[in-house]
Amino acid sequence: MPREVRGNGEMFPLNGPCWSLFFEYIGNIVYALLIRRLSTRLLAVLSFALCCALTWFAVTDQSGYGSIGVGWTVDRTNILGGMLRMLCPFTMGILMSRLFKPLRQARGAFWTSAALLLIIFHVPYIYSDGALSLNGVFEAACIIAVFPLVVWYAASGKTTDIASTRICRFLGDISYPLYIVHYPLMYAFYMWLIKTRQYTLHETWPAALAAVSASIILAWLCLKLYDMPVRKWLRNL
């Protein structure tokens, strides 16, 4: 058989991000069979145990490369890490939905939350040479504490101007189709980089901009021509 695109054993070599959907399917099955039947107290206990397990996995660097970006290939570490990475925030989200009480004052929640996420996403890899992974500490803290607080704060706010409302609606609509269609175009971009040996921003920004623009346009077309019509048809069954 021909070698996969990047040659690193991806679970879904033609569209890498599908690995997370694989675990989401498992999460939905577990929810239907078990989690939805749990009391809020038992759900809290389960969520706490999963948070502890995820922290252990991240801080002790079980992945071997100081990150919990795991689940994308089929081996023991990635299956375990992928399950923890999915079940921990999944159960936390269900618990939050049961206990959610919006903040009274959450003005500018959209812009504040967006700015906070932008800052977090620009934090570089935190190197450490000890027994514990500092980058794992940071990632676990984001998953267990920071991101849930951002979701809570953002969900407490309401967009009051036309621009914010349109931006939020567009980002919400486009997020799923963009996630699932962008990677094949990124593969093409990678192959272009390797073939042309152009690596600097000055050399690559036109191709990078074209790849991003094509991904957004393709996602929008999938949303309008496939996703929305299929959802409408399913609702009418």
PLM feature spans:
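Hydrophobic alpha-helical segments with transmembrane-like composition
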Residues: 1-58, 218, 222
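Aromatic-anchored segments of alpha-helical transmembrane domains
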Residues: 1-2, 49-63, 115-127
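Alpha-helical transmembrane segments in multi-pass integral membrane proteins
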Residues: 5-8, 34-38, 69-216, 232-237
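Intrinsically disordered, low-complexity segments enriched in small/polar residues
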Residues: 23, 174-177, 224
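Acidic active-site catalytic centers that drive phospho-/nucleotidyl reactions
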Residues: 24, 182, 227
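Primarily interfacial, aromatic-capped hydrophobic alpha-helices that serve as membrane anchors
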Residues: 58-75, 218-224, 228
